[in-house]
């Protein structure tokens, strides 16, 4: 999806997808390990074919990378709500896409704990494995 590089955007795509590759991790319990460790050891990747469902995505510009990984970030939930996860790859089918620029977003960040200490490098390793830094 093309959009100006400095615009925050939210997207919902509902429809039937020819293929979609998603990843998920088992539920974790305290003390929480860094996500990059969990993904290396326990990530499960599923490829779904001809599946009905919804993608929800956010796109943040590089200037907002402290809030979310720059560029698009999508999650998927099947229509029957039995399968879902972080989208790694997909082939579209039929569907409807809704895209909206967002100027306001309210986020409550944890004051302490594992989420407050995630490094940009570990986030990039989880969200964009193998990606080269654009900085």
Residue ranges and their predicted role:
Residues 1-58, 65-67:
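Long, positively charged binding patches that form subdomain-scale interaction surfaces
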Residues 4, 67-69, 90, 100:
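Short solvent-exposed loop/turn micro-motifs enriched in small/polar/acidic residues
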Residues 27-29, 72-73, 91-92:
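Short, solvent-exposed amphipathic alpha-helical segments in soluble enzyme
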Residues 116, 121-130:
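N-terminal targeting pre-sequences for secretion and organelle import
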């Amino acid at each position: 999806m093309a959009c100006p590089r400095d615009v925050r955007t939210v997207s919902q795509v509902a429809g039937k997808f020819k293929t979609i590759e998603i990843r998920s991790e088992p539920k974790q319990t305290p003390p929480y390990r860094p996500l990059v460790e969990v993904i290396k050891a326990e990530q499960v990747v599923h490829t779904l074919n001809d599946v009905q469902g919804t993608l929800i995505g956010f796109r943040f510009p590089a200037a907002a990378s402290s809030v979310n990984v720059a560029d698009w970030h999508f999650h998927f939930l099947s229509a029957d709500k039995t399968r879902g996860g972080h989208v790694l790859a997909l082939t579209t089918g039929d569907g409807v896409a809704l895209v909206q620029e967002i100027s306001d977003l309210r986020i409550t960040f944890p004051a302490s704990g594992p989420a407050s200490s995630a490094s940009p490098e570990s986030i990039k390793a989880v969200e964009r494995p193998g990606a080269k830094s654009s900085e």
